[in-house]
């Protein structure tokens, strides 16, 4: 059931699932997981594409959920991305961060990014959006003030990457993203979250619950273990970027 990013649709789907007394609910992304969790505390819920289950109040602890919810997290390797940034742009001083102010998972990633950025003497300037219509204005507000832009795994930004790239490409401003899909959309680089892999992890977890081998309340949140570094070929060319020889990577068009 696809809610088409509509909260009322989500609630209707949750009502339908609980009314049908399904054996397990799979939920993709935080809003879906939260709506399903609000609808039932009995039916097991396995979620994916949720950055921090604990921050989203879906579990008591990521290590030991203590609720009917578990799943796979799309928390990106932020420190590894920062290492990549300073390797490619050693003289960078100011980083712009764009994210949705209404997405709690984005706020958590930005909090971590700001803490980690201090280790690299990077100053962070934030530009928040409330919906996709704000993206170009937010991006424009960073032009001339930052050396590059970071976007976390954020549903609002991810749904309108071309609007962001329209501004950054013209300004020759690199964009480092939280997930690989944005690189395909024109962002410069990412140490990529693989949502297909996260789906497989969540599917395996769901199977174990349905087979009676595990219970969500004692099943720790799981994470992607291996990441690929991906660059957008057109962005690299537009920026005149030289990728260091020791950076193992893939180019996408």
Positions of PLM-derived features:
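Short hydrophobic alpha-helices and adjacent helix-cap/hinge residues
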Residues: 1-253
